[in-house]
Amino acid sequence: MTSEAFEPSAAAAPAPPGRSARARSFNSAAARYAAHRPSYPPALFDALEELAGRPLAGSRVADIGAGTGIATALLHARGAAVLAVEPGDGMAAQFRRLHPGLPVVRGDGNALPLADHCADLLTYAQAWHWTDPARAVPEALRVLRPGGALALWWNINALDVPWIAEESARVARHFGVDTAAERRDIDALGADPGGLPRLTRREVRWSRRVPIDTHLANLASRSVFLVSDEERTAAFLTEQGDHLRNAFPDGTVEETYDVVLLVATAPS
């Protein structure tokens, strides 16, 4: 598939690459992001097909805020005709290196470079929170065909797993961030979709077992680490690595996630 399958909009130019320092921070760490971030389980895409009311195979899908293409590649593997939309220079360049056969265009959810009613499905994997919903909701409804679906999802740390909760608390103390805010924000979006049609929610728990160094590299690819002082980040990663090696002497950890999926259907 080529990007010509989605007709570009003459009026919409690609938006600037990010709304904040945290959003822009991924561009300098794109290779690390691609190498160490978790993927998504097959059950997520089964749930997506169920809630969207259509198979991915043969669907015209635009993956917005595609990053390095983790979700884009999985959508393609399920048979979707998928186009990636990514605002960041570094992330888009890494996408092209990893997925030379998949189309990617520059833009973001606030000003989609796509024609009206051209997509069966819009996906935002770990990306909706970087948009301005007052702009992104009308854009999504403009680009979706009647009856098409908007799908938002996030890998959320499973804070009922003791070692993950302890690590999250350490991150919060060290960097002065609210590590539980992500789930609260998603819960709030589900309760008040802010102009979106009614959102249907599904959660999928999954896990991956990785070496401790891979887990630490995953941590270091998160925006709160990327915008922090390098010395402060290095100190935390060293301390946390020592703690994990004491707790898990075999050198591996099981990262457990809840993928929270929200799906809305455009009016017919």
Where are the predicted features?
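A short SAM/SAH-binding and catalytic strip from SAM-dependent methyltransferases
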Residues: 120-134
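Conserved catalytic/acceptor-binding region of the Class I
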Residues: 135-210
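Nucleotide donor/acceptor-binding cores
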Residues: 58-59, 117
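Conserved Class I S-adenosyl-L-methionine
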Residues: 3, 188-268
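Class I SAM-dependent methyltransferase SAM/SAH-binding core
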Residues: 62, 68-111
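Conserved class I S-adenosyl-L-methionine
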Residues: 2-56, 91
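A structural alpha-helix within SAM-dependent methyltransferase catalytic domains
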Residues: 49, 73-76, 137, 141
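A short acidic, Gly/Pro-enriched loop at the edge of an enzyme's catalytic core
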Residues: 110-122
